[in-house]
Amino acid sequence: MAQSNGAQAITTVGVPKEVKTMEGRVSITPDGVREFERLGINVFVETGAGDAASIPDSHFVAAGATIVPTAADAWAQAMVIKVKEPKEEEFQFLRADLTLFTYLHLSAYPKVAAALLKARTTAIAYETVQLSDRSLPLLAPMSEIAGRLATQAGARFLERPQGGRGVLMGGAPGVRPANVVVIGAGNVGYNAAWIAAGMLANVTILDKNLDRLRYLDQICVGRTTTLASNRGSIERALVDADLVVGAVLVAGARA
């Protein structure tokens, strides 16, 4: 989403500390700071912004950044880069001459969309930046991590102490492995399936894109089963599934 406020050269970038619960990432590394500084763009990092990511203020300073004491100081810059969408406590910092670059997922957060429109902020959502081949380069890293974590978490919740049925992903001598069904063969789905296959589970991937399924057949070399996705194939796959990973993406839509 973007609300144009005129073409202006960006000379300063602010990096506020993330305030969303359980969010420990920071939107820039010291290497990124160096790149901005090389271009003549000054970077202002809120103190402690990188602590949860094990990047202390001193590392940002060594890269050329200026550490500022408050979120307001970081938000006061021409462009602000974040990891997650602004929380309501941050709406006060939105303004017409600000460019905000972050993951927004506006379909899931209508209050954020309304706040951006009201403030007339230029907002660029990482997840909707698209190349000419329709790929989503800024969403891909998040998707890769999400897919791998989905299988890892799913394996844990199959354990009895977590309320599961006591199914081991890779089985054991004389015991079948888990049946894992992945719906969607994009970045999330592929990574979820790859980890499940590495844990020696029986893996089935469903997708409507047959070219994508052909590609996965080639790189997975028999470690997974690919199926054309439709109501019937999904129903049949789910009957015997121990773990199901939903990995369907509609760009810009609510997950």
Where in this protein do the model-derived segments appear?
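Short, charged, surface-exposed secondary-structure boundary motifs
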Residues: 77-78, 110-113, 134-136, 214-216, ...
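Short beta->alpha connector loops at strand-helix junctions that form conserved
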Residues: 46-47, 70-71, 103-105, 125-130, ...
